[in-house]
Regions:
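An active-site-proximal beta-strand-loop segment
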Residues: 44-75, 81-83
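Short, surface-exposed connector motifs at secondary-structure boundaries
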Residues: 71-75, 99-104
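Basic, flexible linker segments flanking DNA-binding modules
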Residues: 1-45, 136, 190-201
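Mobile genetic element proteins and their domesticated derivatives, centered on retroelements
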Residues: 6, 10, 49, 66, ...
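C-terminal domain-tail junction helix/linker
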Residues: 125-127, 149-209
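Active-site beta-loop-alpha junctions of metal-dependent nucleic acid enzymes
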Residues: 59, 77-99, 111
Length: 209
C-alpha cells in the first residue's frame, strides 16, 4: 500500500492528512562533508564515535573512541558516565597538541559532534568535518569496525564492577590493540609500529567560548 492510497483512506474517513515531513538531510557545512573520502596517509582522516556499556549495577558507561583511519591506530578511548561536546573538545585538544592536527574528522550526526562549539573550533584550526548520512553507519566503516572489535573482544565478555575498573581494562585493551594485536590491512602487524612520528602542525589551540 503506497502513501497516496493511505492518504485517500484518511480523507475518506474524515481524518486529517498529516503534512509530509521533509526528508532529513545530512549536515552540510560547505567543506566536502558529503564526500566519501578514503584515507591516504597518516592524519589524513580521523574518525570518532560512541560505544555504550554498563557496570554491573546497570548504570550506563559512555565510551568515546577515536582512530586514525589510515594507520588504524586507536588514538584515544575516553570512558565516563557521560561525555559532552566539551569533553570531546578536551580530548581533541590533548591529541592535537601531542599528535598533531588531522585534515579531516569523520563522524555521525550525534549532538556531541555537531555542536556549534565543536564545529567552530575545528573550523578555526582548519580541520574539515565529514558527517555521514543519518542512519548509515556503513559510511563510517573504519570506526564501526573498530567498535565491533571492542565489543566482541572485551565489552561483551566483561562485567565491570566499577567505572574505574572499566577505564583500566578498556585502556589495557586499547594498548594491546595498538601494540600487539595483528591487523590484516597492515600485513598482520599491529597499528602502532606503522605510525611515523611527525612534528605537530603549528596552531593555537583555544577553546571557543
Amino acid at each position: 500500500m503506497n502513501h497516496k492510497r493511505v492518504e485517500r483512506i484518511w480523507r475518506r474517513e474524515g481524518l486529517k492528512v498529516p503534512k509530509r515531513q521533509a526528508k532529513r538531510k545530512r549536515l552540510w557545512l560547505n567543506d566536502g562533508s558529503c564526500i566519501r573520502l578514503r584515507p591516504q596517509y597518516k592524519d589524513h582522516v580521523w574518525s570518532y564515535d560512541f560505544v555504550m556499556t554498563r557496570t554491573h549495577d546497570g548504570r550506563p558507561i559512555k565510551i568515546l573512541t577515536l582512530i586514525d583511519e589510515f594507520t588504524r591506530e586507536c588514538l584515544c578511548i575516553r570512558v565516563n558516565r557521560n561525555i559532552t561536546s566539551w569533553d570531546v573538545l578536551e580530548e581533541l585538544s590533548t591529541l592535537f597538541i601531542t599528535r598533531g592536527i588531522p585534515e579531516h574528522i569523520r563522524s555521525d550526526n550525534g549532538t556531541e559532534f555537531t555542536a556549534k562549539v565543536v564545529r567552530k573550533w575545528l573550523s578555526e584550526l582548519g580541520v574539515k568535518t565529514l558527517f555521514i548520512e543519518p542512519g548509515s553507519p556503513w559510511e563510517n566503516g573504519y570506526i564501526e569496525s573498530f567498535n565491533g572489535k571492542l565489543r566482541d573482544e572485551l565489552l561483551n565478555g566483561e562485567i565491570f564492577m566499577t567505572l574505574l575498573e572499566a577505564k583500566i581494562l578498556i585502556e589495557s585493551w586499547r594498548r594491546e590493540y595498538n601494540e600487539i594485536r595483528p591487523h590484516s590491512a597492515l600485513g598482520y602487524r599491529p597499528p602502532a609500529p606503522e605510525v611515523i612520528c611527525l612534528q605537530p602542525k603549528s596552531a593555537t589551540l583555544s577553546v571557543v567560548q
